[in-house]
Amino acid sequence: AVIFGATGGVMEAALRTAVESLTGEELPSVDFTQVRGTEGIKEASYEVAGMEVKVAVASGLTNARKLLNMVKNGEAQYHFMGCPGGCINGGGQPQQPGYVRNTTDIRALRAKVLYDLDKSNTIRKSHENPAIKELYSTYLGEPGSEKAHHLLHTTYVKRKING
């Protein structure tokens, strides 16, 4: 899904798949806007197939630390994946000069473009993407398989920002 690059995009895509997998029903709307945004901590709770599904998205390490402290103190319970600003703020993105970063919220603009693209896509659910279905059936096996995990997960490498 194109929204993977925005903070909360992976969570939103995962919710689309999880809800349909758990209920066996097609979603009336694929937009989970409560988990969108490039700042702070976004928490949401959904009733799915008689279960409460609680999710949170933290933008940046400061917010991740706050969320981890909430878990540590027994105030919240979540599983984690951390991306400061999402992929739209990652080391693989074009770097902007300091004067642009100081005057323009590039992350918000990039996120808006991704959500606009997502709205115009015919296929908006990862589990319905024919290319993904083909990849799993011919190469990776089942979602969550050892091969899929090994090939599709990475580790963080700090990148220097120019400018």
What positions do the PLM features span?
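Iron-sulfur (Fe-S) cluster-binding modules
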Residues: 1-163
